[in-house]
Structures are given as structure tokens and as C-alpha cells.
Amino acid sequence: MTWNATLALDYTRQAEKTVAHFRHSGPLRILQSLYPEGDGICHNVIVHPPGGLVGGDTLDLAFTAGAGAHGLVTTPGATRFYRSTGEPALQRTRLSLEAGARMEWLPLEAICYSGCLAENRLTMELASGAELIGWDVTAFGLPAASLPFAHGHFCQHIEMPGVWLERARIAAGDTLLMDSPLGLAGQRCMASIFFVAGSKLERNRRQQALDVAREVIEAHALRATAGATSPDGQVVVVRVLAPLVEPAMTLLRQVWQAWRSHFWQQPAALPRIWSM
């Protein structure tokens, strides 16, 4: 049996409050809206009761933020791509921001189990003046549990149309890609955090974002396998390779906190679900 599910979450600004409305079909839900930072920023948690995707499953997620709204979206646990008998599993996420909107897309990691045939697509569309901080974390197998990513493949697609595109196909049997210094160098977690804007960032603001990120990286244990870059005037990215998810996620959270303060003058308020 396969699952096909959709979820649409819309943030709107009503007076001084960001309000969330959602629609769904299939096993995708949004938990109660929370306001740990006050009415202006709405925190939401996506729940997928089946707990993972197998071959033939499709999840479609669409999030919009209206002018002046600020939403933060996360998950209570990893997205798990399990073994497939032939059909691929697909998760598609689209983030659309109107002028002046802000969004934080902070899901926990995706785990690729051996034998999976999976694709994870993220598309971001931002109007002028909109800004977004998001991340993407992928683990290949569960090394700590002696469950390697021995066969199967994973396709990743991250795009801001006309501005930035990253696409990769990670095949478990591609030893050059998985283990050589030209690829993952034997690491089994790849992660990135990105700040994207709907219009060109001022040069000084963009450089400061790079400097802030590099300062965080230099103080972290993963500094040898992490780096910050700006592939476009609207995008700043930190990429990292790690043996496990936890150290990579720690680095991403530190960069997120630093960027939140730098770009938005907002102290970081960790989503409550992360401490459960």
C-alpha cells in the first residue's frame, strides 16, 4: 500500500499577528500554532504519522507566507526513506513568499535506508523583499547502528528558479562519489543551511553573513569539512560533511542562530519540539 498526501500551509499577517491556515489530504498534519516569540512569529510542526516513505509514496507540501508574515516550520523527527521494491519515493516541498515575508524552513534530517529509491525536492520562490532561512540535512544509512547505505540511490533537488539550482544523484554503489575526496570522502551526512532573498543583498550585508558563518565554522569541530559561499547575490550557503547527523545539525543550528541575529535582529528561539 502506498501513501499519497498533500499539505498546504498559508501564513497571513492580521494586524500584529501571523496566523496559519492549513489544508491537507492523506497522512500529513500540522500541530497547534505556537507563539513562543510573541504574535509576530508563528511556529508550526509538520506531522507524518506513517513515519517514513516507501516506494510509490508521494508527499507534496506547499507553504506560503503573505506580506509581512513570519512563519517557522519544523518536524518532530527524521524523514525516513525506506527500501523500495522498484518504485521511487518522492517528497516535494514548495516555499512561496510574498513581499516582506519571512520564513524559516527547519526540518530534521532525511535518512536514506539501504535499498531506498528516493527523491527530495525543494523549490523556493520569493518576491522582492522576502527572506528565508532554511536547511537541508541528509544521512546515508545509520552508521552508529551498523546499518550502512549499501545499495539504492537518492536524488536531491534544491532550487530558487532563475537564481540557484543544486541537483545531485547519490548512488550507494558509486564508490568514487561516496568515499573519495572528490565526493563525500567517506562521510555519511551532507548538510547545508542557506539564506535566500527575493532581491539582491547589499554587498556589505552579504559579506557580513559570510563572515559570521565562517566565524561559527572556525570554532566548530567540523571546520575542516565545512565552508560558506555565496553562489548568487541573493543566496548565502553553508555546506558541511559529517560522519553523523548530530555534529552537522549542531553546526547548522549555530549558523541559524547567528544569521537570525545578523539578518533579522531576532534572538534564536529553539522550537519546543526539538527538546522533547
UniProtKB/Swiss-Prot annotation:
InterPro entries: UreD. It comes from the Bacteria. Pfam families: UreD. The keyword Membrane does not apply. One of its GO terms (molecular function) is nickel cation binding. GO terms for cellular component: cytoplasm. Its main location: cytoplasm. The keyword Translocase does not apply. It is found in: Cytoplasm. Keywords: Chaperone, Cytoplasm, Nickel insertion. Belongs to the UreD family. UreD, UreF and UreG form a complex that acts as a GTP-hydrolysis-dependent molecular chaperone, activating the urease apoprotein by helping to assemble the nickel containing metallocenter of UreC. The UreE protein probably delivers the nickel. Required for maturation of urease via the functional incorporation of the urease nickel metallocenter. This is Urease accessory protein UreD.
